[in-house]
Amino acid sequence: MQGILPYLINGVSAGGQYALIAIGYTLVYGILRLINFAHGDVFMVAGLIMVYTTASMPMYIAIPLVLLCTVILGFAIERAAYKPLRTAPRMSLMISAIGVSYLIQNVAFYITGGLAQPVKKPIPWISDSIVLFGESTKRVTVVTPILTIALVFVLVALIKKTKIGMGMRAAAKDFETAQLMGVKINSVISMTFVIGSFLEAVGAMLYFTNYPTVGISSGGMPGLKAFVAAVFGGIGSIPGAVVGAFLIGLCEEIIKGVGQSTFSDAFTFALLIVVLCVKPTGLFGEKVTDKV
C-alpha cells in the first residue's frame, strides 16, 4: 500500500487537471452539440502565456494575465470561427474547429520557432515540495483536486442560481425553443466559452507547474484525455466529466504503479472505444434525439 500511495495521490491530481479541461468540452457540447477540437490548443496557449508572463512579471500580475488572455482567446474563437456558422450544418462547425486547432498550432510554432519553452519561474508555493503520508510531492498535487472541486461547486451554483446559468440550461435542453423564448443565445454561448477557457487556464497553470517545458504539442495529450473523460462520464454532463476525469487519472497512475507505464495512455483510448461500443452516452449522459 505504501508503494502504491504516491500513484494514487498523483492520480487524483491528474484527474483534477483533466476535469478542468473536460468541463470545457462538455459545456460546449451541451449547448452547441460541437466537439471543440481547438480546446487542447487553447490549453497549450495558456501554458505558453504562463511561461512568458511569469518569466518577466510579478506573479500577482502574471497569473491574472494568463486567465484574462486565455478567456479573450476563447471568446475570440467563438465569435470568429463558430458564431458565423451557427445555422450551418454541424459538419461545417466541426471542420471550422479543426481549422482553428491547426491555426493556433501554427501561430504558436511561429512564435516559439517550434522549440519547447522552458518554465523558468514556476508558480511559487504550489511548486514547493511537501511530505504527504511519508512521501515527497509538490504542493500542486494536493492543491489541484481541492481547487478543482471548489471550482466545480462554484460553476454548478452559477448554472443553477444565475440568469446566464438558466439560459445555459435552457439552451442545452432545447436550443431552438430557448431562442423562441427570448434567451440571448449569443451571450449564453459566449459565456460558455469564457467559462471553459477560464477553467482551462487554471488547469494549464496547475498542469505545467509539474513540467519543465511547454511546447506546441503540449496540449494534445491532456486535451485528448480530457475528451475521453468527458465521453466516459457522459459528454454534456458536468458531474460526468468530473467523475470520468478522476477515474481516468487514477487508473492511469495505478497502471504506472504496477509497472506498466507504457500502457497508461493506451488504456485511456481503449476505454474510449469500449465506452462508445457499450454505452455511447457515458455514465451520466442522456440519449439525445434530433427533432424533426
Predicted regions and their residues:
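Helix-loop-helix "hairpin" substructures at the membrane interface of multi-pass membrane proteins
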Residues: 14, 133-214, 238-243
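Alpha-helical transmembrane segments within multi-pass membrane transporters and channels
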Residues: 58-100, 107, 243-248, 279
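Membrane-embedded helix boundary and interhelical linker motif in transport proteins
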Residues: 9, 31-76, 80, 85, ...
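Residues that define the loop-to-transmembrane-helix transition and helix capping
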Residues: 38, 60-61, 91-92, 163, ...
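Transmembrane helix-bundle core of multi-pass membrane transporters
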Residues: 84-161, 188-191, 254, 259, ...
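Hydrophobic core segments of alpha-helical transmembrane domains in multi-pass membrane transport
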Residues: 47-52, 67-73, 100-108, 147-156, ...
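Transmembrane alpha-helical segments in multi-pass inner-membrane proteins
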Residues: 18-22, 57-68, 190-200, 206-270
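Membrane-interfacial amphipathic/re-entrant helices at transmembrane-helix boundaries
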Residues: 1-20, 49, 60-61, 88-93, ...
